[in-house]
């Protein structure tokens, strides 16, 4: 569905991504987790076509959409994007925001689906209101519906809950996951919140220094972290010094076999 091959990218000679590779399957929700500045949002911008790729290759449905000499525009990639700040047009009504940029024939085709989605998440009564009349949670719900208006196969979610309080975050998160599952839409979520990643994801990719440190299921990363860097993302850890000898490590707690 979505494939990254050996992606490298820099801003003003500062390397952001370094030989990054990853694959997202149809219907999967994958989270990118990592510290600020590790390249998470840059990956979304490259995959969605907002930025041009410097080195490597990105495929959607097995077709190259980005490489050093190929760039398919965003509107031709069959993707949706939910921004951290919603990015709604303040001078347009909610319904106008949702259908912005779509042709009349596309609007007619998608109208019933969009209205059903709005009813499902309880925002149908907001159709004629303007963004400033909505709460932060309602604006984020509108942003999700807008991202789905063109019937995309992949949705990119850039820290969509970061500006919401914890109670509202849980509600919106549940709604979003339900809709993604119901419509079998793949999603790539950027977050710095490990709890959010564990709840939402089929797989998690932890980034460090511009590349994948570990990629796998939430339970895999939690129970079998490959490094202290990974373990620290999912809770407090105790670090013990030891010496390695004959395939085992000797610590104050005893001797343990080294993992392969």
Regions found by a protein language model. Give the residues of each.
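ATPase nucleotide-binding modules
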Residues: 226-260
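The feature captures the beta-strand-to-loop junction immediately N-terminal to the Walker
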Residues: 33-35
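Conserved structural motif at the start of ABC-family nucleotide-binding domains
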Residues: 2, 17-19
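Conserved ABC transporter NBD signature motif
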Residues: 56-67
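Short beta-strand immediately N-terminal to the Walker A/P-loop
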Residues: 30-31, 81
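ABC ATPase nucleotide-binding domains
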Residues: 78-80, 84, 88, 93-229
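Helix-to-loop junction immediately C-terminal to a conserved catalytic motif
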Residues: 48
């Amino acid at each position: 569905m979505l494939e990254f091959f050996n992606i490298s990218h820099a801003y003003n000679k500062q390397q952001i991504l370094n030989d990054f590779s990853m694959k997202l399957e149809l219907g999967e929700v994958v989270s990118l987790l990592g510290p600020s500045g590790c390249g998470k949002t840059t990956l979304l911008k490259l995959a969605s076509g907002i930025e041009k790729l410097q080195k490597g290759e990105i495929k959607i449905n097995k077709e190259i959409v980005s490489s050093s000499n190929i760039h398919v525009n965003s509107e031709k990639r069959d993707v949706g994007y939910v921004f951290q700040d919603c990015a709604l047009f303040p001078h347009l009504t909610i319904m106008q925001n949702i259908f912005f940029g779509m042709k009349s024939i596309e609007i007619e085709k998608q109208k019933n689906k969009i209205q059903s989605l709005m009813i499902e998440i309880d925002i149908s009564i907001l159709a004629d209101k303007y963004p400033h009349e909505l709460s932060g949670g309602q604006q984020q719900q509108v942003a999700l519906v807008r991202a789905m208006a063109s019937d995309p196969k992949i949705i990119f979610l850039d820290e969509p809950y970061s500006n919401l309080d914890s109670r509202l975050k849980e509600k919106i998160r549940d709604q979003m996951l339900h809709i993604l599952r119901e419509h079998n839409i793949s999603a790539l979520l950027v977050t710095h919140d490990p709890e959010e990643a564990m709840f939402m994801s089929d797989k998690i990719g932890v980034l460090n220094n511009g590349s994948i440190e570990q990629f796998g299921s939430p339970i895999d990363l939690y129970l079998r972290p490959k490094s202290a860097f990974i373990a620290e993302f999912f809770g407090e850890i105790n670090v013990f010094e030891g010496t390695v000898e004959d395939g085992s490590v000797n610590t104050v707690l005893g001797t343990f076999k080294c993992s392969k």
